[in-house]
Amino acid sequence: MTGDDFAVALDKIRLRLGTQNFDLDCTFPQGQVTAVVGASGSGKSTLLNLVAGFEVPDFGRVVIHGQDMAASDPSERPVSSIFQDNNLFAHLDIFTNVALGVSPGLKLRAEDRQRIEVALARVGLAGFDKRLPGTLSGGERQRAALARALVRQKPVMLLDEPFAALDPGLRAGMTALLLDLHAETKNTVIIVTHHPDDIKKLAQRVVFLDRGRVVYAGSTADFFATQNVKAVDSFLNG
């Protein structure tokens, strides 16, 4: 493996959480969208947590842009995360929620404020600065979370089923927005999803997990043509 080939690598990772063992060895190409897929409990969120630094492997390395992350706290890693519940602070307006992505202490320069306004406009939330999260729809809250990730300007974005709570119309809108933003930023996106349509529309590659192990890692086209892998067949055909 060379740093030119991938943005993120889980290099011979071993981790035990409770009674479950995880053995993860896979890479995520620079500038591509990779879908992480598998049944409930297969290790999808654990994989993201390892990349983000919320879980520490018992053995092996997490490598991001050629750097071993062993000594890097989550706040020091070049990643932004978006979760299903969007993690917005209910008592803070949307501008302030997004501003936390720039400065946790809210020490903002004029250029920081401009960057926040640009991000809000880019996700379709211009004029929402003073609104509280509770006054927004589910799709609007996810757009605010995406704006917060954008202002962090990190090269790797982790998304843990960010559209799961949205209806089909909102899902389609968020999918289109994510594609547009990826075309602009060229960042590396790792998205956990259980929707085959999301995989087809968003991802160039797929990593499929089964009981804590990688059983497929390759192109999206080849994934949907995979045969004789029971876990993949169950996912694709119910």
UniProtKB/Swiss-Prot annotation:
GO molecular function terms noted in the UniProt entry: ABC-type thiamine transporter activity; ATP binding; ATP hydrolysis activity
Main location: membrane
Keywords tagged on the record: ATP-binding, Cell inner membrane, Cell membrane, Membrane, Nucleotide-binding, Translocase, Transport
EC number: 7.6.2.15
Recorded superkingdom: Bacteria
Membrane topology listed for this record: Peripheral membrane protein
Start and end residues of each ABC transporter domain: 1-236
Catalytic activity: thiamine(out) + ATP + H2O = thiamine(in) + ADP + phosphate + H(+)
Family annotation (SMART domains): AAA (SM00382)
Xref: InterPro entries: AAA+_ATPase (IPR003593), ABC_SmlMolc_Importer (IPR050093), ABC_transporter-like_ATP-bd (IPR003439), ABC_transporter-like_CS (IPR017871), P-loop_NTPase (IPR027417)
Annotated compartments: Cell inner membrane
GO cellular component, one term: plasma membrane
Class in the EC hierarchy, top level: translocase
Binding site for ATP: G38, A39, S40, G41, S42, G43, K44, S45
Record flagged with keyword Protein biosynthesis: no
Family assignment from sequence similarity: Belongs to the ABC transporter superfamily. Thiamine importer (TC 3.A.1.19.1) family.
Subunit annotation: The complex is composed of two ATP-binding proteins (ThiQ), two transmembrane proteins (ThiP) and a solute-binding protein (ThiB).
Function statement: Part of the ABC transporter complex ThiBPQ involved in thiamine import. Responsible for energy coupling to the transport system.
The protein's name in its UniProt record: Thiamine import ATP-binding protein ThiQ
Organism: Agrobacterium fabrum (strain C58 / ATCC 33970) (Agrobacterium tumefaciens (strain C58))
